[in-house]
Amino acid sequence: SVVKSEDYARPSYVDRRDYPLPDVAHVRHLSASQKALKEKEKASWSSLSMDEKVEKTVVGAAMFFIGFTAILVILEKRYVYGPLPHTFDKEWVAMQTKRMLDLKMNPIDGLASKWDYEKKEWKK
């Protein structure tokens, strides 16, 4: 059998988190229905059928309401909700954790079971 080598003259597609939308198409060989859809994308909006116009309107309305909801959430977080309680401060959490360790709370399988009381450090 003959091994086919990759064409390195063309850009290659790789799924990576740091580059989510590469310049390469996900599908290299389009089917007949996909080619027809590509040609339809180039046409005018007025050439759409009534069902397609209704579908476009529904999707547009859904996106509008999702965006409006996002704006409401941002405004609520900024102007409605107050600041976080002092118990969320890092210093408070550190004091609370130290107190839990001093009281040896849940020594079997909890936080105190992972603390070495002789060395005063977390077990490894």
Swiss-Prot record:
- Pathway the protein takes part in: Energy metabolism; oxidative phosphorylation
Q: How does the UniProt record describe the way this protein sits in the membrane?
A: Single-pass membrane protein
Q: Output the InterPro entries linked to this UniProt entry.
A: Cyt_c_oxidase_su4_fam, Cyt_c_oxidase_su4_sf
- One GO location term (cellular component): mitochondrial inner membrane
- Where does the protein end up? Mitochondrion inner membrane
A biological process from GO: mitochondrial electron transport, cytochrome c to oxygen
Q: Does the keyword Acetylation apply?
A: yes
CDD domains reported in the protein's UniProt record? Cyt_c_Oxidase_IV (cd00922)
Q: What Gene3D superfamilies does the annotation carry? A: Cytochrome c oxidase subunit IV
* Annotated positions of the N6-succinyllysine modification: K4, K35
UniProt entry keywords in alphabetical sequence: Acetylation, Membrane, Mitochondrion, Mitochondrion inner membrane, Phosphoprotein, Transmembrane, Transmembrane helix
What protein family is recorded? Answer: Belongs to the cytochrome c oxidase IV family.
| Name of the protein this chain belongs to | Cytochrome c oxidase subunit 4 isoform 1, mitochondrial
Natural source organism = Saimiri sciureus (Common squirrel monkey)
